[in-house]
Amino acid sequence: MLERHIADYHFIADPTTGMTMRWGTTIKDNPTWAPVPELADISISNHCSKGCSFCYKDSCINNEFLSVEDYCRILDSMNHPQYGNVFQVALGGGEPLEHPDFLEIIAETCRRSIVPNFTTNGMQLTPKICGSLSGKIGAVALSVSSMADLEKKKLAFLIDAGIKTNIHYVLSKNNLEEACKILRGCYNEMLNGINAIIFLTYKPAGRANAKDVIQDSKSFRAFLSLVDETSIARPRFGFDACFVPMLLKFSHINPLFIDTCEGAFFSVYIDHKMNVSPCSFSAGKDSYSLKDFAFYDIWNHKFNSYRIKWKSNCSVDCMHKSLCHGNSPYYPQITICHE
């Protein structure tokens, strides 16, 4: 069991089940932020050979890699002298598996008792690499924008190695109908053995086109109605934080089971150039370099104005307004209920 108790912030997690609990002064209170981030999202490169048209990082074949030495500096900078380090990291890119020192990065993470997770396009997955990662990884996410992108043999490599596997499905206005089929259970056989499918909100950043952002439509409402459906056999599913305002506004999911955006509140993003920001979509805004500032100077002080602004920025008449941070800080157009 993982635990952290600091003043009016309390957190426990079961690494086996993934169940977490967070509370404030009493069990009914929510803490505003964590004195030590629970998770760090780290881009270990901006190098990727796949060239997806919707890549929000605009990654390409550029050999921009975070060195192992700088990666270790990042991890050690987050190790609070009194309260310890982050519990886990989510490694991204670029494509993490194209980093020449990827396995060493995993080893350095584990050596510090931090759980590594990573997202991949799957191109570089082999039985050998999956065998090397077995027992060392919290979870792997395969990123797709269409079920046609999902190779069953790549899934099998991960599942056969005993690695918890999620699907990250990038949800745009172009694939809402296919997403509805997923929630109707039409792809159950293909998705057999996965842990969950996570729908990621399409962001108009990098190479992604603004015209493909989700809009209020018949397909969108049909998708939300299927979210509420409880009688269909289908894989477990979830959403990224950017979709949460729409869930709170339009669905009937119990809000107690929904976490709003945690960037700069409970999680942090660090890019391959060692810039620290609330999340990977900040595009250089609210960003501070670890080469210029100590991590806890950034976390405890530099992010304060961001937290004040976005703690409750919802301007919509909604019964769950008090639970919602409001629209996306960097791409308000992706929040359909934003006015």
What annotation goes with each model-predicted range?
Residues M1-Y9, P15-M19, W23-T25, E38, ...:
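Flexible mid-to-C-terminal extensions adjoining Fe-S/redox cofactors in radical SAM and related proteins
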Residues P31-Y71, Y83, C279-A283:
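Canonical Radical SAM [4Fe-4S] cluster-binding loop centered on the CxxxCxxC motif
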Residues G51, G93, H272-K273:
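Residue-level recognition of short loop/turn positions
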Residues V68-G92, H99-K203:
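Radical SAM/AdoMet-radical enzyme domain recognition
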